[in-house]
Amino acid sequence: MVLTKAAISENLFEKLQLTKKESKEFVEFFFEEVRKSLEKGEAVKLSGFGNFQIKKKKARPGRNPRTGEIFLITARRVVTFKAGQKLKNKINNYLIKKNNNF
């Protein structure tokens, strides 16, 4: 199972009694704010969930595994996510409970 923006929007519609349009706009606005911050190189810290950050990767040599051709992988920025301790604990507690039910 995969959680999608549409599913998040539907949950907001059902649980917070927003209109479908409002719930969709809320989800879009949230992700747009996260994207804008990351584009500027700012970290996004969501208390109780985790942190998104931009890491700079230096240019480095790479190799095509099929042809063996050496080429330069250009410098770039990548998004990383580090789960917060509360999220890690909830996931681990869920897995422990799930495994004990077998």
UniProtKB/Swiss-Prot annotation:
Gene Ontology BP annotations: DNA recombination; positive regulation of metabolic process; regulation of DNA-templated transcription; regulation of translation
One annotated GO molecular function: DNA binding
Keywords annotated in UniProt: DNA recombination, DNA-binding, Transcription, Transcription regulation, Translation regulation
GO cellular component: cytosol
CDD domains per the UniProt record, alphabetical: IHF_A (cd13835)
InterPro entries (UniProt xref): Hist_DNA-bd (IPR000119), Histone-like_DNA-bd_CS (IPR020816), IHF-like_DNA-bd_dom_sf (IPR010992), IHF_alpha (IPR005684)
Task of the protein: This protein is one of the two subunits of integration host factor, a specific DNA-binding protein that functions in genetic recombination as well as in transcriptional and translational control.
Subunit text: Heterodimer of an alpha and a beta chain.
Family classification: Belongs to the bacterial histone-like protein family.
Record-linked HAMAP family: IHF_alpha
PANTHER family (alphabetical): DNA-BINDING PROTEIN HU, INTEGRATION HOST FACTOR SUBUNIT ALPHA
UniProt name for this protein: Integration host factor subunit alpha
Species annotation: Buchnera aphidicola subsp. Acyrthosiphon pisum (strain APS) (Acyrthosiphon pisum symbiotic bacterium)
Gene responsible for this protein: ihfA
